[in-house]
């Protein structure tokens, strides 16, 4: 019975750019293509950036300037939990009369889990609750900025050279109207510069004088190459003999979370600005319709569009697994659940020999030969005890039980291997009423919803074989 909750035992095959097998709860269904979609075959689009602690929302440009981190929230450098601001009272001398003191509020950062505080690393307390915390300076900041500036200029030069070669090849085919426009150069660092097209009849040799910024003197950035050091500083003599206090040594994770400083001791751990999270939309690459689109507000957990597959495709689950033995036929109980409100007709089919999708099967399966009818989903009917059940004239050898929009069926499994996991594969053919807006106008007498038949490849894992 526990297998009923183990949805990862039942995998659906997605026929996308690459074949993906995943539980139905991790898949999406495109109503326009009428196909399953996984995270591997959709386009991911960033809608908004927000801080998971203070829920501050910011546009992408601002998030890029802040290096995708929140300016007001911090993570503990020891245990990576969110730091909270604590207030305390300290006595300070009055500027007019040094002999007298007054109480003043001071704020510091503290972790409620590992008890780390900003005072442990010598950070001064602040008179305001937010902002202005002391941050360690990276000793290599100037070198990195110089390298970034150099490679940005190098990318612009390469872009100009490529455009010059393109114009040289096309100089005899450029029309007059086209030659009066400009080319907008966008390099890999998202920096743009505009190059003026040559006048009609002008020689292409005039392009040789083009600079990166027309009308401006572009100063060439020069960098000093890194120098290899022949001699390195030796380790202290007591490096291998002195006792190590593990509480004062940082872990590998703590060092990798601060790659610019690489702290060795716990006294060098400084708080890190909290990483921003994103709300993203998923779009089908084939028809470019949205499969998932969340609300813009960070406090909202609702979705404007959420085409998850469990709301459209019948779900198969394993209810009970008997003792499976080599070359002995066993009866397995499965459940089929109809997620839509209308009747759904389902037919289970065995995989053909030589089926390229049937590569993981290790057992022979016998599925019900008859068509199964699943009742529509009705949330109110589940609590109505006086509702009369529908008579579907089920065969007791095939259907074990029926309740609301769920039906239990028997399949027969015969393992074909002496050891290993028992896996069976079959095809599930079902009808689907496409509720998406039709492209053509609906004529009089024509049905508004189109009924189509879909086929899903399902793989069931029953666990290890008994001896």
Curated annotation (Swiss-Prot):
Residues 152-172 form a coiled coil. Its main location: cytoplasm. Keywords: Acetylation, Coiled coil, Cytoplasm, Cytoskeleton, Isopeptide bond, Phosphoprotein, Ubl conjugation. InterPro entries: DCTN4. It is found in: Cytoplasm, Cytoskeleton; Cytoplasm, Cytoskeleton, Microtubule organizing center, Centrosome; Cytoplasm, Cytoskeleton, Stress fiber; Cytoplasm, Cell cortex. The keyword Hydrolase does not apply. The modification Phosphoserine is found at residue 203. The modification Phosphothreonine is found at residue 414. The modification N-acetylalanine is found at residue 2. There is a cross-link at residue 222 (Glycyl lysine isopeptide (Lys-Gly) (interchain with G-Cter in SUMO2)). GO terms for cellular component: cell cortex; centrosome; cytoplasmic dynein complex; dynactin complex; focal adhesion; kinetochore; sarcomere; spindle pole. Subunit of dynactin, a multiprotein complex part of a tripartite complex with dynein and a adapter, such as BICDL1, BICD2 or HOOK3. The dynactin complex is built around ACTR1A/ACTB filament and consists of an actin-related filament composed of a shoulder domain, a pointed end and a barbed end. Its length is defined by its flexible shoulder domain. The soulder is composed of 2 DCTN1 subunits, 4 DCTN2 and 2 DCTN3. The 4 DCNT2 (via N-terminus) bind the ACTR1A filament and act as molecular rulers to determine the length. The pointed end is important for binding dynein-dynactin cargo adapters. Belongs to the dynactin subunit 4 family. Part of the dynactin complex that activates the molecular motor dynein for ultra-processive transport along microtubules. This is Dynactin subunit 4.
